[in-house]
Amino acid sequence: MSDITVLGIFVADISFLGNKIPITGETILGDSYNVGPGGKGCNQAIAISRLGGKVNFISKLGNDDYGKLAIDKLKKDNIDTSNIIISNKHTTGVAGIHVDKNTGKNAITVVRGAPSSLTTNEINIHSIKQSKIFLTQLEIPIEVTLYCLKFAKESGLINILNPAPACKLGEDFFKFIDYFTPNEMEAEFYTGIKINDKNDAKASAKKLIEMGIKKVIITLGEKGLVVKEAKEILDVEDVIASILIVDDLRIQKN
């Protein structure tokens, strides 16, 4: 039995570090490169497991070297991989990441690969019942995400949706969500309210509650968080500054 089921994608992050990010038509010499686990769902599963949670990870991989890398990495973090589908027709997802080592800025191209072909018929839906919490994002096909959210809610789980990458959602989505965790840009996408400060974030959170979501957590980077439920709003100051944020490159290096 797992504490939490994560539905999401794995992509092999291929990161190139150098003094700059190449522009169109330019070839540059980099300093180093690294290959490691990526994808929001994969990163969330690893983070939860390292915090002591038991994780069931649902995804789809290609039957290739990167797929084997994924299984190996997940198993090393004690994540249940028994509900990952392996495809002989599709490749494992990859992301090419150019990183400017001086500024930390990056440019990323993601090819989702196998997860983009995931269907409801392939998922062992009943494995979700063995968890207390269901967590997902918007990297898996929308119809699959909605199917799993609905099943999880009907099975009594707490549903958490990290709405990234932001995309248009039907009203059906919101009634199955207990916790909605957008960042500033994603909150603006769903509410139309541009967030320049905490007051804007509070207004955005209030509007999301009015759309039918039970609890909203808007992440504001180093500015902290805004947490909103029907009768209460909480302004969390500077919480992020006191926490070590482990970025993708550090996760890759374990």
Where are these regions (language model features)?
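Conserved phosphate-binding/catalytic loop of the ribokinase/pfkB sugar-kinase fold
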Residues: 86-87, 97-133, 138
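Short beta-strand scaffold segments in enzyme catalytic cores
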Residues: 46, 94-98, 107, 224-228
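Short gly/ser/thr-rich secondary-structure transition/capping motifs
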Residues: 78, 113-120, 159-166
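Conserved phosphate/ATP/ADP-binding segment of small-molecule kinases
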Residues: 153-233, 240-246
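Beta-strand->loop->alpha-helix junctions that form or flank phosphate-binding loops
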Residues: 32, 58-63, 81-92, 162-164, ...
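Glycine-rich phosphate/adenosyl-contacting loop at the front of the ribokinase-like
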Residues: 1-60, 65-79, 243-251
